Amino acid sequence: VELCDVQAPEFAQHGDHAVAADAPLVLVACSGGRDSMALAAVSHIVCTSMGVRCGAVIVDHGLQEGSEQVAGEAANRCRALGLGPVIVRNATVQARGEGLEAAARQARYNELCAAARESGAIAVLLAHTMDDQAETVLIGLLRSRGVDALAGMPQVFTRSGVTFARPLLTLTRAETTGICEDLGVEYWDDPTNGDAVDGELPNDYPLRSRVRHDLLPAIERFAGFNVARHFAESARLARMDKEYLDQRSDEVMGEAVTTVDWPASSAAVSTDTPRACAAGDTNDSGHGVGLMIGVRRIAREPEAIRLRVIAHALSQAGVNASAAQIAAIDRLVVDWHGQGGVSLPRGYSANRKKHVIRVCQDGAHANR
């Protein structure tokens, strides 16, 4: 978000100016920790100097004893800094298969988006630092692979129609601590970070806390230099590659992939192109949602693009396929010798017929 784009004209001139009551609003997501309190303090100074309102939103996850008090203290500190409005929201965290950390993150973003929409904020600022970026890269490598794992967190992104920005990705946690000390800003240290624990953290601590407390320091001792900065710069470069690959894949997907509502049964149709199949498979005898992938179009692309197109298409259809399943579908494109279809989650399957790969939940339909 470029604040200069929403700056009130009079604030470009010297002198004291009051921020208008209807000026654009930016919200700082604040947990009360050192990073978010530093961001709140600096954001208020910068926004006020540009005629932009600066508020805060505090999300109480209710997962720790005393969380209500922590949220209240964070809100009071933000008000003391001059931020307004200061919004406190209570999140409902329901951990399912994704784990407690992921469920808490989803609940937090739900509340941040709701607060932004209700207040009319033009953006929500997040206090992730260079250290957080390095931790994210390591977690990505542990849980995933490829350029997406290396790309870390984007500086600006949109979620549920709300713009989020991370202004502190070039600052370290030591620097945000210094900002708080220089400005006399008090902050809260989350006990789940394990800062006060001697030795390795137990396995029941959050993965990010263990990476921060144990893994990153061990790598730094081994490497003999600031690996957080190294990982963060690697993430920036990998994100540029990822954004290009995503853009190119989206272009190819728009030409090669069609999402369709298939009937349970229909007369035989031409299978030379995905759009021909989609047009022919229409009647009122029932349907299933699926994909048609044009082999001739996608086969012209390099493997990196083909795999990305297949993965993105399946994701949009609600199919969370593994890397092995995506590679098997790619073999239907470039190594077709009459092999059988590929079984996918949620009862889906992918089958090739002439120059089209059909992905649907009705295996018999896909094999017609």
Predicted segments, located by residue:
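Short, glycine- and charge-enriched coil/turn segments that flank and shape catalytic ligand pockets
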Residues: A18-A23, T48-G51, Q94-G97, E118-A121, ...
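Residue-level signal for short amphipathic helical patches enriched in basic/charged
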Residues: A107, D132-Q133, R145, L171, ...
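Core alpha/beta nucleotide-donor-binding catalytic domains of modification enzymes
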Residues: V1-L216
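Extended, compositionally biased low-complexity polar/Lys-Gly-rich tracts
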Residues: A23-L39, I45, N203-A223, G280-L314
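Mid-to-C-terminal catalytic/tRNA-binding core of tRNA(Ile)-lysidine synthase
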Residues: E2-F11, D250, G254-S270, C277, ...
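Mid-to-C-terminal catalytic subdomains of enzymes
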Residues: T177, L183-R236, M240, V309, ...
